[in-house]
């Protein structure tokens, strides 16, 4: 299991990223560490929000690196929506530049921290 962290200072957000080979093996540890209730670990990725400004990105590496990259994009999109809502910004299809930059920032940070 690999655990990395980063901040999004502009929105005062704290992100934990957990990468595991088979998250089912870590379910008890992860549930205690992040105060989770999820017991079904047959997934590619998940987002848990512990508070308005603390989020946990769970990534399951058992499907391989190529699948992992698309999962990071997918979960980064969900996380960008969660963050935008938590800071009071409603998604706007005609003015979505802020969300596009946030999505890129999240994806690039996760990719860099996990050395992918």
Protein language model features and the residues they cover:
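Short, charged/polar N-terminal "headpieces" of proteins
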Residues: 1-38
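Short alpha-helical catalytic segment bearing the HExxH-like zincin motif
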Residues: 67-75
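Post-HExxH zinc-binding segment in Zn-dependent metallohydrolases
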Residues: 90-116
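Short, solvent-exposed segments of well-ordered alpha helices
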Residues: 63, 67, 91-94
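Catalytic Zn2+-binding segment of zinc metalloproteases
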Residues: 76-93
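Active-site scaffold of zinc-dependent metalloenzymes
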Residues: 28-66, 79, 83
């Amino acid at each position: 299991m690999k655990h990395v962290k980063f901040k999004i200072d502009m929105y005062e957000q704290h992100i934990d990223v957990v990468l595991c080979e088979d998250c089912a093996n870590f379910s008890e540890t992860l549930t205690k560490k992040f105060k989770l209730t999820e017991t079904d670990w047959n997934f590619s990725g998940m987002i848990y929000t512990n508070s308005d400004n603390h989020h946990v990105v769970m990534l399951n590496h058992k499907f391989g690196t190529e699948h992992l990259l698309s999962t990071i994009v997918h979960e980064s999109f969900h996380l960008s929506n969660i963050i935008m809502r938590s800071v009071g910004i409603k998604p706007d299809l005609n003015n979505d530049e802020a969300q596009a930059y946030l999505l890129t920032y999240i994806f690039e940070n996760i990719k860099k921290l996990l050395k992918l």
